[in-house]
Design a protein with these regions (language model features):
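Short, small-residue-biased leader/transition segments that mark boundaries at the very start
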Residues: 2-10
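Gly/Thr-rich phosphate-binding beta-strand-loop-beta motif of the actin/hexokinase/Hsp70
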Residues: 9-45, 149-162
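Hydrophobic "anchor" residues
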Residues: 42, 99, 166-167
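Glycine-rich phosphate-binding loop and adjoining helix at the ATP-binding site
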Residues: 45-146, 287-298
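Glycine-rich phosphate-binding/hydrolytic loop that grips phosphoryl groups
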Residues: 123-138, 282-355
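Glycine-rich phosphate-binding loop of actin/hexokinase-like ATP-binding domains
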Residues: 143-201
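A mobile "lid/hinge" subdomain adjacent to the ATP/sugar-phosphate binding pocket shared
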Residues: 197-268, 273-275
């Protein structure tokens, strides 16, 4: 079940024997926060709230306040929390703790800004990289040497696994799959360029196309699709597709085919062992598979793609939260634990029964 995840109440735990991490998953519109134990399980309810990042000078302050309030409402002392991992959209330099697209901290790293206010170590990374970390450590990319993790959401992100490690590129900006110029459609992307993959295949575009077709009188279960609540609209769209609605299936299939065209280019360059569709859009499940495969059939040299596995993530909406927790574990300060390796081995040994 893609919509369930193990949860344990803090009262069920022996607090003195365990440590925790706070995982924060952000996209351009919605943020989620949860407390997790080192066995990769939710210990608190997921707190979700709207936080628009574009042109929002208060976004960083708001995020910090929400994290601090979340911590204050826990029954667990902050000394039991190893740190806070945050996945977020944008051009993120994880090493410097800077997001060049959103939530500027006036020259200070976001890590330092948030950490100084909540008194815990903070680590940030791009949302698609964080999702790829989740797949690499605990998901479909585990023990794979090369993998491409597609983050189908309001944009179309990419996490690259090369030689068994997350590849971030020179400045940490690798994986801007959304902005591969694929179309001569005269559509302006939010990056300022024309014809990017995102302009035909993001979930925002799919919802926009749905509204257009409904306005033209197309019969569909999508009638009444929300206009100003895109997350709810996305859920309605995916649910309608799962129920066999022709319009919903058509729109998602078109997006999937276009993503497949982009994937064909990447396969020619990287020849990966596996391609994993993850992130928000993965909740549509097998609807994505046939159109992506059809695009590969048409645009990819058979010898290059015939041994590449395509898989839907088992994490569903949880991928970014799991990856944010991994982000803390991978940066674990030696002063907080005997050995980083011991921490990771604890998680690895339990993940098969936790997910």
């Amino acid at each position: 079940d893609l919509h369930s995840f193990p949860t344990r109440r803090s009262s069920d735990l022996h607090i003195a024997d365990v440590m925790y991490v706070v995982a924060v998953a952000m996209d351009q519109l919605v943020t989620k926060i949860v407390l997790m134990d080192l066995q990769n399980r939710y210990v608190s309810e997921v707190e979700k709230f709207e936080l628009s990042l574009a042109n929002n000078r208060e976004a960083l302050s708001t995020l910090t306040t929400r994290i601090d309030n979340f911590l204050n409402n826990l029954s667990i002392d902050r000394s039991k929390i190893l740190g806070i991992g945050i996945g977020m959209p944008g051009f993120v330099d994880a090493a410097k703790g800077i997001n060049y697209s959103f939530m500027h901290a006036n020259g200070q790293s976001m890590n330092e800004y948030i950490s100084s206010r909540v008194n815990l170590p903070v680590f940030i990374d791009n949302d698609s990289s964080v999702i790829a970390l989740a797949e690499l450590r605990f998901g479909a990319a585990h023990n794979k040497k090369s993998a491409m993790v597609i983050n189908a959401s309001w944009g179309v992100g990419l996490g690259l696994i090369i030689n068994g490690e997350l590849f971030r590129g020179h400045n940490g900006f690798a994986g801007e799959f959304s902005h591969i110029p694929l179309f001569l459609n005269n559509k302006l992307c939010n990056c300022g360029k024309m014809g990017c993959l995102e302009t035909e295949s993001s979930l925002l575009v799919v919802i926009e196309k749905a509204h257009k077709e409904l306005k033209e009188g197309k019969a569909s279960l999508l009638k009444g699709l929300p206009h100003d609540q895109v997350e709810q609209a996305c859920e309605v769209l995916v649910d309608a597709a799962a129920r066999g609605d022709k319009l919903a299936v058509k729109l998602l299939s078109e997006a999937a085919y276009n993503i497949g065209r982009g994937v064909a280019i990447l396969i020619h360059i990287l020849n990966p062992e596996i391609i994993i569709l993850s992130g928000r859009g993965s909740s549509a499940g097998k609807i994505w598979m046939a159109p992506i495969q059809q695009a590969l059939n048409e645009h990819c040299i058979p010898r290059l793609c015939e041994n590449t596995e395509i898989k839907i993530s088992g994490f569903g909406f949880h991928a970014e939260l799991v990856g944010a927790a991994v982000l803390v574990m991978e940066h674990y300060d030696m002063s907080y634990s005997p050995k980083k390796g011991q921490l990771l081995s604890i998680v690895d040994s339990t993940v098969s029964t936790s997910l």
